[in-house]
From Swiss-Prot:
Native source organism of the sequence: Mycolicibacterium paratuberculosis (strain ATCC BAA-968 / K-10)
Role this protein plays: This reaction introduces a second double bond into the aromatic ring system.
Gene name tied to this protein: aroC
Entry protein name: Chorismate synthase
CC cofactor: FMNH2
Pfam families: Chorismate_synt (PF01264)
Length: 404
């Protein structure tokens, strides 16, 4: 048997639709197409987004695995229609098309000048394509809409099974000074989503907007850093027993698998490497209900397991590789020097990246929860969680009393 919870996406950027399939979700989780649409609308947010976000509406259809707003326990398939499909149905048709029709289509012009930083070059060589179109269609960040759809189901499960909330905020765009204050809570999410750059701090927001404006004026693009916070996790998701069971490794792999993400850190991450051990770890003290800590430098993970503290995951997104002023490249058809192709793109997609990272973190946490607690229905999973929490409380009882 494979992993207890699996997901896969299908579809191209300008194809008929994107599809997400989530297998292994328990029965009884409340989820609707409206829930998914709301999360997809959050993905379209952000200052610096391109023209596509102004008309793409992400028409959601739940095809299977849900009945009357409740999951059934079988594979869940979600389709997200592409608004522009009528313009592309000849160029992106799955069945053969009359070559004369394709020859008359400007949209079918060969794309032979790969963009530095994109999948174009390696994809053309790896798969034997003379044209970058088949590469960029699947490599496009448009695919992340399907991940957000699957992640919406995962976050609903986490909320209903554990009371866990997953949220994100942008902490830096380009060279703007990163936000280093306390992380936001669930009540802060509406204000974050109302921010043009999904920033928690107003001063940081203004600096980020200024960076985007400057890049847009210069015909350039920007990356940045987002932080995802998960609140309410129990102790013990993940394991120390082998590398592939460590939750930090699973989270890093899932987040690094998002288009344009080039770095991941848990908690204070790289800053911890510059500290002495006495200043790097989160000391523990007896408290009213068990062990308490005054810091969370580890970001909620120790030894590959959740430790009951808020989970903090940061992801670094590189600048978008479709640069308006075009970078130097080689025309793969002629071998001549050239400038890279320019497809319609964003100046900055960091605010949207936070929503995508939320989705991937939620999927990994949902999988870890099901691996730990099992169950075929939400009610059964909850019973298992309740029993585990009682057992943990008993083990923590000496610390709760302040005794050895």
């Amino acid at each position: 048997m494979g992993p207890v919870l699996r997901w896969i996406t299908a579809g191209e950027s300008h194809g008929r639709a994107l599809v997400a399939v989530l297998e292994g979700m328990v029965a009884g989780v409340e989820i609707t197409s409206t829930d998914i649409s709301e999360q997809l609308a959050r993905r379209r947010l952000g200052y610096g987004r391109g023209a596509r976000m102004s008309f793409e509406r992400d028409a959601v259809s739940v095809l299977s695995g849900v009945r009357h707003g409740l999951t059934l326990g079988g594979p869940i398939a979600v389709e997200i229609g592409n608004t522009e499909w009528p313009k592309w149905e000849t160029v992106m048709a799955t069945d053969p098309v009359d070559p004369a029709q394709l020859a008359d289509s400007a949209r079918n012009a060969p794309l032979t000048r790969p963009r530095p930083g994109h999948a174009d070059y390696a994809g053309m060589l790896k798969y034997g394509f003379d044209d970058a179109r088949p590469v960029l269609e699947r490599a496009s960040a448009r695919e992340t809409a399907a991940r957000v759809a699957a992640g919406t189901i995962a976050r609903s499960f986490l909320r209903q099974a554990l009371g866990v909330e997953v949220l994100s905020h942008v902490i830096a765009i380009g060279p703007s000074a990163p936000y280093e204050g306390p992380p936001p809570g669930p009540g802060d999410l509406p204000a974050i989503d109302a921010s043009p750059v999904r920033a928690y701090d107003e001063a940081a927001e203004q600096a980020m907007i200024a960076e985007i404006e400057a890049a847009k004026k210069d015909g350039d693009t920007l990356g940045g850093v987002v932080e995802v916070v998960a609140l309410g996790l129990p102790v013990g998701l993940g394991s120390f027993t082998s590398g592939d069971n460590r939750l930090d490794g699973q989270l890093a792999a899932a987040v690094m698998g998002i288009q344009a993400i080039k770095g991941v850190e848990i908690g204070d991450g790289f800053a911890t490497a510059r500290r002495r051990g006495s200043q790097a770890h989160d000391e523990m003290y007896p408290g009213p209900d068990g062990v308490v800590r005054s810091t969370n430098r580890a970001g909620g993970l120790e030894g590959g397991m959740t430790n009951g503290q808020p989970l903090r995951v940061r992801a670094a997104m590189k600048p978008i590789s479709t640069v308006p002023r075009a970078l130097a490249t080689v025309d793969m058809a002629t071998g001549d020097e050239a400038v890279a192709i320019h497809q319609r793109s964003d100046v900055c997609a960091v605010p949207a990246a936070g929503v995508v990272v939320e989705a991937m973190v939620a999927l990994v946490l949902a999988r870890a929860t099901l691996q730990k607690f099992g169950g075929d229905s939400l009610a059964e999973t909850r019973r298992n969680i309740d029993a585990y929490r009682r057992a943990v409380a008993e083990r923590e009882a000496p610390a709760a009393r302040g005794t050895a």
